[in-house]
Amino acid sequence: MNLLLVLFSALTLLFSCGNGDKNKEKQAVATDSVMVTDSVTPYAEMQVKENCFIVISKPELKLYVCEVVGTDTVRLVEYPVCMGRNLGQKQKKGDMRTPHCTWEEPFVITEIVNASNWSHDFGDGRGSILAYGNWFMRLKTPGFSGIGIHGSTNNEESVPGRASEGCIRLHNDDLDILKEQYAYKGMVVVIKAEEEGLKPFEQKYY
């Protein structure tokens, strides 16, 4: 984790030009609907790439795993995602928005939990159903709680798209690969706002 922080700090300094003012709007504490459980499966720290971080793009509805390689940053893999059904920064509980952050103050994965038996009632007449895939990657999102990256059991058709209550949904198979090959506790996650442009290292992919 210390190595990643050093590398990510260097990346931020290198690509910080043109970011504009930080989002200063007030953020109310919010808890999205996530089943609370005492059953936590420890994450076996195998195949961890501590020089990797995640970028989630609201405009593109994609999750990218990126790696700092020397003075460069490269994309390793990308996955389609489903995000909050409403646009903009999250303001309060139940507003159906996904929070975004800055490169200077990114989110962090605080734990990776076995969510294979988690259920949720979406209020659509289906009742309480399995909804999270095998894993829930909980994010530290200051001002909010209950936000994470998870699967899309019984909602696979929503990916890619905008249909969640604020979390980031992946196809279950993609989530499993992300967990096994890249994700780890302490991993940096940047969620980009709808209007945010591209960093220099991102421009080479377009």
Which ranges hold each PLM region?
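N-terminal post-signal-peptidase region of extra-cytosolic proteins
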Residues: D38-F53, P80-R97, W118-G125, S152, ...
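Exported/periplasmic cell-wall-interacting domains
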Residues: Y43, H100-T102, A115-Y206
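Sec-dependent signal peptide recognition
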Residues: M1-S9
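C-terminal motif of bacterial Sec signal peptides marking the signal peptidase cleavage site
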Residues: L14-S16
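Bacterial signal peptide processing site
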Residues: G18-G20
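Coil residues (strongly favoring Ser/Thr
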Residues: S33, S39, D72-T73
